[in-house]
Regions:
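Ribosome-associated RNA-binding proteins
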Residues: 1-154
Length: 154
């Protein structure tokens, strides 16, 4: 991993820890302090990704809408004329649970937090949830604020 010039990262064998420090001469530099926090968070995310892994669950919601795996590609049938085929990036695992009903859960997992989030975001961007019928691709924990729609006979 490349580290900013104002930040030093080193593995301390005796403590079995990674120490991230601001380089000498830059202790009062606001940019160096910001880079220190970013570097520390990136290293923490790498360690957590290797030990526990990251997972996001997406829901494909809609009548007749579903997701399936076709080899190493995710195939989304979401109310368009053609199915959307998304290649799964290297290092990610996508599992589609075939559930009865209108919700199809899709689990995205991997060791790289950024890659998991980016693939989930790209999947959601194909068909964002809409507030009137609730159809779309959404995060499992996401709550869609519903709207009433037209009123007749005012």
């Amino acid at each position: 991993m490349t580290v900013h010039a104002k930040v030093k990262a080193a593995f301390v064998e005796a403590e079995k820890a990674v120490k991230v420090t601001v380089a000498p001469g830059f202790e009062n530099d606001a940019d160096a302090n910001a880079q220190w926090g970013t570097t520390r968070a990136l290293i923490r995310n790498m360690i957590e990704g290797v030990t526990k892994g990251y997972e996001k669950t997406m829901h494909v919601v809609g009548t007749g809408w579903n997701a399936s795996m076709a080899g190493k590609n995710l195939k989304l049938t979401v109310g368009l004329a053609n199915s959307i085929v998304m290649p799964v990036p290297e290092g990610l695992t996508v599992v589609v649970d075939k559930a009865a009903g209108e919700i199809t859960p899709v689990k995205i997992s991997g060791v790289n937090r950024q890659a998991v989030g980016q693939f989930a975001s790209a999947m959601r961007a194909k068909r964002k949830p809409e507030p009137y019928n609730g159809k779309g691709i959404k995060y499992a924990e996401e709550v869609i604020k519903r709207k009433q729609g037209k009123q007749f006979g005012a």
